[in-house]
């Protein structure tokens, strides 16, 4: 029986690091961000709809979508942002479910759905258990400012654009505290996998 684990966190909480740890354990990780990029490539249904909805002005000379230009349009206009989400999100969901179900059919013990905005998108129903990668707010802020070269206000705006980590923590089945060393984080992950290996769905 396959246990489907939802993996989420906040910006700069270290979720990608934990996703890599799952992969190092030989566990399939279905990455929503990677799929979102694939979903808008030429020849995909979402690509066609974006070109029709937003016009050829959002296409590069190669025919690929100009992500920067599209980003500028949707961040400046809430209605356009919702339009884009309505095109892309259903396709991403479909592709994620397909990859999840392939892992289940293959009889894998675990499969991880790595979804940054899992709760915000209401996708927890696709999983059996949810892990939130958590760090204290001060550390999240410090890491984000350093990683993205942002000032404090810019970093805070990005953090507040998502549901707070403490809120996600309350809703999760398990929390990995990523404020210590990588070794600490890895130990928590292995402990969880050991515990969940013994449960039936």
Curated annotation (Swiss-Prot):
DPCK domain: residues covered: 4-201
Enzyme class: transferase
Listed GO biological process terms: coenzyme A biosynthetic process
Keyword list, A-Z: ATP-binding, Coenzyme A biosynthesis, Cytoplasm, Kinase, Nucleotide-binding, Transferase
Pfam families reported for this sequence: CoaE
Catalytic activity: 3'-dephospho-CoA + ATP = ADP + CoA + H(+)
Location of the protein in the cell: Cytoplasm
Any GO molecular function: dephospho-CoA kinase activity
EC assignment: 2.7.1.24
Pathway: Cofactor biosynthesis; coenzyme A biosynthesis; CoA from (R)-pantothenate: step 5/5
Binding-site positions, ATP: 12-17
Membrane spanning residue stretches: none
GO CC aspect terms: cytoplasm
Family annotation (InterPro entries): Depp_CoAkinase, P-loop_NTPase
Main subcellular location of this protein, as a coarse class: cytoplasm
Cited HAMAP family: Dephospho_CoA_kinase
Function: Catalyzes the phosphorylation of the 3'-hydroxyl group of dephosphocoenzyme A to form coenzyme A.
Family: Belongs to the CoaE family.
Protein name: Dephospho-CoA kinase
Gene: coaE
